[in-house]
């Protein structure tokens, strides 16, 4: 299945299917162990009120990055699915470029290195310049061959609207998730 076909599905399906995939930005990255799905029809999504300059990439083609700044501090990375929907990358198990990620994050703790969307962004060197870039274009590298469709699920973190939806997915038993399920 092509990347475009993989991401041309509902974000809830994609978020679950990304668990176990390998994702790298340049030489740094690891195994995706936690994701959250967002859809334009639910009020927690940045796209709920329609396209804006900030969320324009969420309405672009599937298999592209949507990068936004959270709390004015952290760059967060989403993978665009169907128009107005995407998957937030919440946590990775670091496997490559560990020293570089430790330098960027100013920590040596592997468990905390990419545990949470802001930490993922900082460790991978994510910034606004990557917004709208295709996931098949450098510096991105996404390998879906190890992805598992056996993810555990729970409610999303840090939201107040549509908080009851179990659209957070994780790799069962992983110590690298941002919060236990």
Swiss-Prot record:
NCBIfam families: 3mg, PRK00802.1-3. The keyword Transferase does not apply. Keywords: DNA damage, DNA repair, Hydrolase. SUPFAM superfamilies: FMT C-terminal domain-like. GO terms for biological process: base-excision repair. InterPro entries: Formyl_transferase-like_C_sf, MPG, MPG_sf. This is Putative 3-methyladenine DNA glycosylase.
